[in-house]
Amino acid sequence: GSLEMLGIDRRDEANIDEMYKLGAQERLRELGLYPTFVVTGNMPVVLRESLLPKAFDMGERTVEKSIDLFGGMIGPFCLETIVTDQLEFKVFEISTRIVAGTNLFISGSPYADMLEPGMSTGRRIAREIRSAQKSGRLHEVLS
């Protein structure tokens, strides 16, 4: 298998991402404000450079484990994580489909641009399908 990083995002969740700026939790409760985690959007992120090797290692291990378990994954996936204040990743979900983290940059991200300027997730998938069709291997990339 192989790994290409096409993008990184940060999920915005209703009020939990900003509540700490509003004051003491006790006062907020008095006002009837309670933290919520409703997803309201996603923001593109350029990861701190020192974290990139860890991110790639997690991705590579995911690809390797998928090969061991069921012959590998086809297409994009996203490791949904939190980062501790010790700069350690904690994975809480794997999304094996096109999600915000894999498709946030419509015309390519700084990471996808390293593969080819303007490369989006959709364009990358289309390229793989065209290549497989031309070489008679379409059955290998479709599920």
PLM segments and residue spans:
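Cysteine/selenocysteine-centered motifs that mediate thiol-based redox chemistry or coordinate metal-sulfur cofactors
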Residues: 123-143
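ATP-dependent carboxylate/phosphate-activation module, predominantly the ATP-grasp catalytic core
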Residues: 1-65, 95-122, 126
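Conserved metal-phosphate-binding beta-hairpin within the catalytic cores
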Residues: 64-103
